[in-house]
Amino acid sequence: MIRTLDGGFLIRYLIESYGEGNTSVGLLRLGPNRQELWTKTIGGSMGIAGRGFQKVSDDEYIMSCSLFDNGKNSYNAYIIKIGDSGDIIWDKIFGGEENDRARSIVQTLDGGYAIAGSTCNYGNGNKLDPDLWLIKTDSEGYSRSFDD
């Protein structure tokens, strides 16, 4: 739950679809008098688990998630920037063929983002022993990869 500039709240919660086995992330925006302003569901047919969540400006929020890809039967890191009215400003997927998960996210001094998570694609490449994974992006969520 995050306090908004107008004195309201933005609340993130998990939605479980018991019949389909997928999870979604729900967002509920409450105004200063605790009235519902809007709700949004992110996920749908692909399972998603929200992790890191924080306010990054007066009217924008950033969330790190792990997004399940049914076609690959694995997770990817998923980063979403959300406006105060519930609109998705941008979203980015990071990862490869095996499980890659985003755990936490912070805004960096240059306006970009640092994401911490785990990977089975990079590092030792062992599917059963994930490595720490750090991603640095610019303010629009773009990143570059460097080989060893």
Predicted regions and their residues:
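A sequence-level/structural motif corresponding to short, flexible coil/turn segments enriched
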Residues: 1-148
